[in-house]
């Protein structure tokens, strides 16, 4: 991974926008354009959600398919243990934004952060209370779906200690906000800072699109805002 112009970032920069020119990543099968991230003429622009439109109250989640509320083999949002843990974290009648913030904070504070050599599994992560970014993401997705919040996993790169690394985080659909909001339980962020570059969104099968890509791209930072 080669970087240039990266001195414009401070550690875990949380500015409103930055642009990265993508010299190596092919557009095929990647989700580079959508939500807070745009892709035009080889340039990715990412804007923090607070820099976009103001929250819209009462807007229906037309962009949040019903499937993002349902359990999967690895995001077991209907399991009794997941639902019991949810009840211990936040009240069922709490505002949606408050639910999301509490869930992000709980996963951030209660999971030991270390690599796990297995397919990320929300239930197993809840039981073992340990994992890397993938485990944080699937557990947050399961808790959010159990709370009635459409949730998915995003995968790409994140900037840390002067370099970009593979990373996974979440996107939550909040009706009170009026759209998708990123969340990173590893760093306890909602929204996630703008150094998160999304390549794909979805379950483990979508992440297979990244094989051969991570570690073989060059990113040139064109602009960083604060």
Language-model region placement:
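Intrinsically disordered, low-complexity N-terminal segments that are enriched in acidic
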Residues: 1-56
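Active-site rim recognition segments
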Residues: 60-62, 146-149, 164-226
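Secondary-structure boundary elements
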Residues: 58-131, 139, 201-208, 212-226
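Composition- and surface-driven signal marking solvent-exposed, interaction-prone regions
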Residues: 103, 119, 155-156, 166-168, ...
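Short, glycine-/Ser/Thr-/acidic-enriched flexible segments
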Residues: 24-25, 50-53, 158, 177, ...
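Cysteine-centered nucleophilic/redox motifs
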Residues: 103, 129-155, 170-173
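Generic beta-strand/beta-sheet core signal
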Residues: 47-51, 152-156, 173, 183-186
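Solvent-exposed loop/turn segments at secondary-structure junctions
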Residues: 110-113, 133, 158-161, 189-190
């Amino acid at each position: 991974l080669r970087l240039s112009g990266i001195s414009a970032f401070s550690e875990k920069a949380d500015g409103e926008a930055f642009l990265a020119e993508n010299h190596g990543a092919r557009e095929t099968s990647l989700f580079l354009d959508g939500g807070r991230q745009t892709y035009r003429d080889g340039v990715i622009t990412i804007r923090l959600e607070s820099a976009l439109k103001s929250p819209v109250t009462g807007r229906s989640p037309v962009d949040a398919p019903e499937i993002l509320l349902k359990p999967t083999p690895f995001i077991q949002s209907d399991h009794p243990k997941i639902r019991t843990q949810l009840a211990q974290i936040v009240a069922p009648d709490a505002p949606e934004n408050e639910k999301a913030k509490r869930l992000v904070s709980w996963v951030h504070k209660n999971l030991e952060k270390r690599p796990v050599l297995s397919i990320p599994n929300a239930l197993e992560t809840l039981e073992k209370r340990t994992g890397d970014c993938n485990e944080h993401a699937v557990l947050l997705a399961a808790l959010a779906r159990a709370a009635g919040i459409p949730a998915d996993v995003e995968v790409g790169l994140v900037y840390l200690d002067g370099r970009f690394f593979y990373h996974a985080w979440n996107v939550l659909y909040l009706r009170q906000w009026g759209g998708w909001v990123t969340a990173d339980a590893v760093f306890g962020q909602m929204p996630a800072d703008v150094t998160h570059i999304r390549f794909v969104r979805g379950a483990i099968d979508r992440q297979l699109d990244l094989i051969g890509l991570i570690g073989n791209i060059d990113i040139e930072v064109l602009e960083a805002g604060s």
